[in-house]
Structures are given as C-alpha cells and as structure tokens.
Amino acid sequence: NRTVPVVILTGHLGAGKTTVLNHLLRHPGLRAGVIINDFGAINVDAALVQGQIDEVASVSGGCLCCLDDASQLDEALDALSHPKLALDALIIEASGLAEPGTLARLVWLSPVTHIRLSSVVDIVDAKRHFDTVDLGGVPPRRYGVASLVVINRIDELTAQERVGQVVRIEARIRQRNPRATIIHTRH
C-alpha cells in the first residue's frame, strides 16, 4: 500500500518552472512521473521534458485549477501512480496561471488512493517578481501554500539589486508563511 508523493511545481509565467523541473529530472536514480499543465492546445513544456522522464502525462485545454472537473488530473495521477511503474515521485508542473492553493486542494481531495501531497514548490523570478506577482498590499496567497520557495534568476540581478530585492521578497514570503523554506538559484 505504498503511496507516491506528489510535488506541485508552481510559479508565474517565465519564472523558470521548466528549468527547475529539468534540473530535478537529471538527478541520477530518480524515477519520476511528470504531469504537465500547459495552457492551450499546444504542449510546449511537454516537448521540453520528453526523454528525460520515466512517465509523462499532459493536461491541456486550460489551467488545472480552472477546469470544469478534475477528471483529467485524477486520470493522470491514477495512471502515473500505478504500482507497476514504481515511480519515486510525481511532479505536477502547473501552468503559470495556476492558483497553488486550489491545485493543492485538487490533489489533496483526489479520489486516487495511492498518492499523497508531499509539497508545493513555488518558483519566484527575482528580477520581475514585484512587477508580475506581488504588487503590494497583502502578500499573495501563493506564499502561504508553498513549503519551498525558490527565488530564481538571482544571477540576473546586480549585486546591489540582489541585496534589496531578495531581502524584500523573503520578507513578503515570511509575512504570509514563516515556515516556508526559501532557497536562491541561478537560471
């Protein structure tokens, strides 16, 4: 009765989700299944990761958290978590439009019995974050759902920008979620 951990990978459009996913998939010995949610009919992200993963499923036609029902997601979770595949983990790469909390609830409430929600990883674009995701006021809800926040693209900031911008992003995350683990990465 083994359950397969599900990791939800979220982030705004262009934050670096596919880059982070590709990095994870290169980890030797990891047998992962990936569910990719591309917004639209052409699955660009699916093409980018083909050949690097053990099993893949794509859910298209809209943002996972906005679909009329979760049956496509449930079917993908069920197929990829089948015991015969013996995968170590399932990774859902969400559309940049996805609401992390809604997506986490869909996995949590899924009727698929051999999965468990492991974590929500939110990818943040250090350079464009305050122009795209966090526009001020109350910190975005997405921070509250994430168990891990990856502040990505810090290499695109000058040393001076890095100090101010990263500290500001971390402070906003901590306002909403003091327990989140925060790491920095280069694109």
Predicted regions and their residues:
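A short alpha->loop->secondary-structure connector
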Residues: W108-L117, P139-Y143, V166-Q175
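Nucleotide-state-sensitive switch-loop elements of NTP-binding domains
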Residues: N1-T10, A15-T132
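Residue-level signal for inorganic ion chemistry
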Residues: D38, E93, A146, N152, ...
